[in-house]
Curated annotation (Swiss-Prot):
Cell division among keywords: no
Bilayer topology annotation: Peripheral membrane protein
Disrupted-gene phenotype: No clumped-chloroplasts phenotype. 31% reduction in root hair growth. Phox1 and phox4 double mutants show no clumped-chloroplasts phenotype, but a 46% reduction in root hair growth. Phox1, phox3 and phox4 triple mutants and phox1, phox2, phox3 and phox4 quadruple mutants show a 70% reduction in root hair growth.
Name of this chain's protein: Protein PHOX1
Organism: Arabidopsis thaliana
Length: 745
C-alpha cells in the first residue's frame, strides 16, 4: 500500500529546489512536505478501505449465489486494498478458504494456505483455525486437525464446532492406537502466536543492535564502512553467498537486515514452540495484599518455587512458603513432596495459591536441592516476564513495553484495592462457607415430602422439554424437504427429469425423518398435541408429493402409487383428528380448573413459589383458544380439499363427501362465504372451472393467512411451537412435479 504514497513523495520532492533546508530536512519546507504527504496517504487509504469493504459485500453476495470464483476474485482484490494489519484481512482470507473448500477436495491445500495467511494477520481468529482443521481432517492429516481444534478449545472452551471436530478426530486416532492423551497434554496450554508481532520484535532488536554498533565508530569513512559491513555480514542470503557491503551501500544493508529478520523469526517461533511443550500450571503468589501470577511446571521442585518467588519479590531476604489446607490452616512447605501434596489438595479450586510469609534469613528452612540449576534459573527468568496483573499469555512481547505495562497496571490495582477495601481471599472463603451451609440445608429439603411434588413438576417439565427437542428436530427435516431444484438453462428434458427425480427422493427421505422425530416426541409425551398436528401436516405434504410424482405414469385406483397416496391421507387425517381431540380436552380441563397447570400453580402457592408461572387473563385465553381452533380447522380443511381432488381423479365416489367436510372446516375456521364459494366453484369436478387452470387451495389459504395475519398474530397463538407449522408454505417441488409430469411431454 506504500507505492502510491511513494510516488507522490518523489514528485513533490523533484519540484522542490535543492536548497539546504530541503536536503537536510531542517527547514519549514520539509515539514510542510511531510504533512501534505501524510494527509494524501490518509485520504488514499480511506478510499482504499471503503472500496475494500464494498468488494467484501459483493463477494458475500456472490458466495450466497454459489459463484465461488467471482466471490474469491472480490475477496482477493479487497485484501490487496487493505493494510496488512487491518481487522478484515483475516476474515477475507478465511472467506477465500471457504470458496476453495466449496470447489472440491482438490482445492483444500489452497484453502489451508489461505487459512495460514489469515492466521498471520490475526493469530487468534478461531474461524480460520476451524476451517484449516476441517481441511486437514478431509485430507487425513488427523494430527494437524487435532492440534488446530485443540488450540481453538484452549481459547474458546464452549466452541461447539471445535469440540465436534476434536472428538471426531480423537476417536479416529484412538482407533489407530495413537496415544491422544499425551498429544492433548502437550497442547492443553498452547495458544496461537502471530508472526507479525514476532517480526516487529526482531526488527526492534536489530535496530537497537545497529544503533549500538554505530555509536562505537569514530565518525570516519572507514568506521562507517566497517559498521555497515559488520551488519551485512551478519545477515546471510538464502543461497549462502555473502555480499560485499562496501560497494552496495545502504540499500543492500536494509535488504540484508530484512533477511536476518526472517531468519530470526524462525528462531523465535521455534523457541516459542519448544517452550510451549512444557506443561505448566497457573500459580498465585500471595504476599500480604500483593498477589502475583506465575507459571510453574507440573513437576516443579520446591527449590524452583523458591527461586521464582525470589525473582518475583526481590526485596524479601527470607521467607516461608505456605499453603492453605482443607481445614483452613496455613501449612509450611519444606520439601517437594509437600509441594505436590499441596497442589493435589487445591486442584479443584482452579488456581493454586502459595502464601509467602517474610522471616529473617536465619529462620528460613533448608530446602531439598536439585542438580539442574541451569533449568531453574532459566525458568525463573522466564516466569519473571509474566505480568503482575495476571496476564499469563504465551505471546512474546518486547521487554520495555512489558515492564511499562506491568508497572502501570500493578499501581492501578493496588490503588483500587486500597480505595474500595477489596480482598479477594475473603470472597473465596465466604463462598466456601456458603456452599457448605447450602449443601447441608439442601440435604434436609430434598428428602422432605414437599420436595417430591416439586420433583414431579420438574420431571414433567423436563419430559416436555425432551419432547419439544424431538419436535424441533422434526421441524428441521421439514425445512430441509423444501430444498429448491435448480435447472440448467440449456438442459435437456432427460437432465431435468434426473434433477426432478433426485429432488423427489431427497424430499421423501426428509419427510420420513421428520415423521420419525414427531413420532418420537409423542412417545416421550403422549399428550404432546403439537407433534401430532405437525405429523399430520408432514403426512399431508408427503401425500401431495407422491401424488404429483405418480402423475408421471398411468394413475388408477389399482396402482400401488395411488394406494400409497390414500394411505398417507388416511394417516394424516388420523393424526390431525387425534391432535385436535387432545387439544380440546386440555382446553376443557383448563376451563374447569383441573388442568396440570392449575395443579402445579396450587402447589407452588402453598410453597410460596407462585410467581414462577405466568398466567394470561380470561379474555386473552378465550381469544387465543379461538385463534388456535381457527388455524387447526384451516389446516384440516386444506387436507380434505386436496384429498377430494385425488379421489375425484381416481374415480372414487367419496370425493364429494370429502369436499363437504372440507367446506365445514373452512366455515369453522372463519373463512368468508365468498371465498368458500370461489373455492368450490373452481374444484376440478365443477363444470364451471376454468379449463387448463388448476385451482390451488394453498394459494387461497396463504391469502387468508396474509389477510388476517396482523390481527391474529397481534393477539397471539397459545403455543409458539406451532407458529412455523401455521406459517408454512407449500413446497415449490410440488408445482415442479405437477408441471413436469402432467404438462406436455
Amino acid at each position: 500500500m506504500g507505492k502510491p504514497t511513494g510516488k507522490k513523495k518523489n514528485n513533490n520532492y523533484t519540484e522542490m529546489p535543492p536548497t539546504e533546508s530541503s536536503t537536510t530536512g531542517g527547514g519549514k519546507t520539509g515539514k510542510s512536505f511531510d504533512r501534505s504527504a501524510t494527509k494524501s496517504f490518509d485520504d488514499d487509504m480511506t478510499i482504499f478501505i471503503n472500496r475494500a469493504l464494498e468488494l467484501k459485500e459483493e463477494g458475500n453476495k456472490l458466495f450466497q449465489k454459489r459463484d465461488y470464483e467471482g466471490a474469491m476474485f472480490r475477496y482477493d482484490k479487497a485484501v490487496k486494498l487493505l493494510p496488512r494489519d487491518h481487522g478484515d484481512v483475516a476474515y477475507l482470507r478465511t472467506s477465500m478458504a471457504s470458496c476453495y473448500m466449496q470447489m472440491g477436495l482438490g482445492e483444500y491445500p489452497n484453502a489451508i494456505n489461505e487459512c495460514n495467511l489469515a492466521l498471520e494477520a490475526s493469530p487468534r481468529f478461531s474461524k480460520a483455525l476451524l476451517k484449516r482443521a476441517r481441511c486437514y481432517e478431509a485430507l487425513n492429516k488427523l494430527d494437524f486437525a487435532f492440534r488446530d481444534s485443540r488450540v481453538v478449545l484452549n481459547m474458546e472452551p464452549e466452541n461447539v464446532s471445535a469440540n465436534e471436530i476434536f472428538e471426531r478426530v480423537k476417536k479416529v486416532l484412538v482407533g489407530k492406537g495413537i496415544d491422544v492423551d499425551e498429544m492433548e497434554k502437550n497442547l492443553v496450554n498452547v495458544q496461537p502466536v502471530g508472526a507479525a508481532r514476532l517480526r516487529k520484535i526482531v526488527k526492534e532488536r536489530l535496530r537497537k543492535k545497529k544503533k549500538k554498533s554505530m555509536t562505537m565508530t569514530n565518525g570516519g569513512n572507514d568506521g562507517e564502512r566497517k559498521s555497515v559491513e559488520a551488519v551485512v555480514e551478519d545477515a546471510k542470503v538464502d543461497n549462502g553467498e555473502e555480499v560485499d557491503s562496501g560497494r552496495k551501500g545502504k540499500a543492500i544493508e536494509e535488504k540484508k537486515l530484512e533477511d536476518k529478520v526472517a531468519v530470526m523469526d524462525k528462531e523465535v517461533i521455534a523457541s516459542e514452540i519448544k517452550e510451549d511443550a512444557t506443561v505448566t500450571r497457573t500459580v498465585k503468589l500471595v504476599h500480604g495484599d500483593d498477589i502475583r501470577w506465575a507459571q510453574l511446571p507440573l513437576d516443579s521442585s520446591v527449590v524452583l518455587v523458591r527461586d521464582v518467588i525470589k525473582d518475583r519479590f526481590p526485596a524479601l531476604k527470607g521467607f516461608l512458603i505456605k499453603y492453605r489446607d482443607s481445614e483452613g490452616d496455613l501449612v509450611t512447605i519444606t520439601t517437594t513432596d509437600e509441594l505436590r501434596l499441596a497442589a493435589s489438595t487445591r486442584e479443584k479450586l482452579g488456581s493454586f495459591r502459595l502464601y509467602i510469609a517474610e522471616v529473617s534469613p536465619n529462620q528460613e528452612p533448608t530446602y531439598d536441592v536439585i542438580d539442574n540449576d541451569e533449568s531453574t534459573d532459566k525458568f525463573a527468568k522466564g516466569s519473571s516476564s509474566v505480568a503482575d496483573n495476571g496476564s499469563v499469555g504465551d505471546f512474546v512481547e518486547s521487554e520495555k513495553a512489558s515492564t511499562s505495562l506491568e508497572h502501570w497496571i500493578f499501581q492501578f490495582a493496588q490503588l483500587f484495592k486500597n480505595h474500595v477495601g477489596f480482598d479477594s481471599d475473603s470472597y473465596l472463603e465466604l463462598h466456601n462457607l456458603g456452599m457448605k451451609l447450602y449443601t447441608e440445608a439442601m440435604e434436609d429439603i430434598v428428602t422432605g415430602e414437599d420436595a417430591q411434588e416439586l420433583f414431579d413438576i420438574a420431571a414433567d417439565k423436563f419430559q416436555e422439554m425432551a419432547a419439544l427437542a424431538m419436535f424441533n428436530w422434526g421441524n428441521v427435516h421439514m425445512s430441509k424437504a423444501r430444498r429448491q431444484i435448480y435447472f440448467p438453462e440449456d438442459g435437456s428434458r432427460e437432465t431435468i427429469l434426473e434433477k426432478v427425480e433426485a429432488g423427489f427422493e431427497w424430499a421423501k427421505n426428509e419427510y420420513n425423518k421428520a415423521a420419525e422425530k414427531y413420532e418420537g416426541a409423542v412417545k416421550i409425551k403422549s399428550d404432546f398435541y403439537e407433534a401430532l398436528l405437525a405429523l399430520g401436516q408432514q403426512q399431508f405434504e408427503q401425500a401431495k408429493l407422491c401424488w404429483y410424482h405418480a402423475l408421471s405414469g398411468e394413475v388408477d385406483i389399482e396402482s400401488d402409487a395411488s394406494q400409497d397416496v390414500l394411505k398417507l391421507y388416511n394417516k394424516a387425517e388420523e393424526s390431525m383428528e387425534k391432535g385436535m381431540q387432545i387439544w380440546e380436552e386440555m382446553e376443557e380441563r383448563r376451563l374447569n380448573g383441573i388442568s396440570n397447570f392449575d395443579k402445579h400453580k396450587e402447589l407452588l402457592q402453598k410453597l410460596g413459589l407462585d410467581g414462577i408461572f405466568s398466567e394470561a387473563s380470561d379474555e386473552e385465553s378465550a381469544e387465543q383458544t379461538a385463534n388456535m381452533s381457527s388455524q387447526i380447522n384451516l389446516l384440516w380443511g386444506s387436507l380434505l380439499y386436496e384429498r377430494s381432488i385425488v379421489e375425484y381423479k381416481l374415480g372414487l365416489p367419496t370425493w364429494d363427501e370429502c369436499l363437504e367436510v372440507a367446506v365445514e372446516k373452512f366455515e369453522l375456521a372463519g373463512a368468508s362465504a365468498t371465498d368458500i364459494a370461489v373455492m368450490v366453484k373452481n374444484h376440478c369436478s365443477s363444470d364451471n372451472a376454468l379449463e387448463g387452470m388448476g385451482f390451488k387451495i394453498d394459494e387461497i389459504v396463504q391469502a387468508w393467512n396474509e389477510m388476517y395475519d396482523a390481527k391474529r398474530w397481534q393477539i397471539g397463538v397459545p403455543s409458539f411451537r406451532l407458529e412455523p407449522l401455521f406459517r408454512r408454505r407449500s413446497p415449490k417441488l410440488h408445482d415442479i412435479l405437477e408441471n413436469v409430469f402432467s404438462g406436455p411431454q
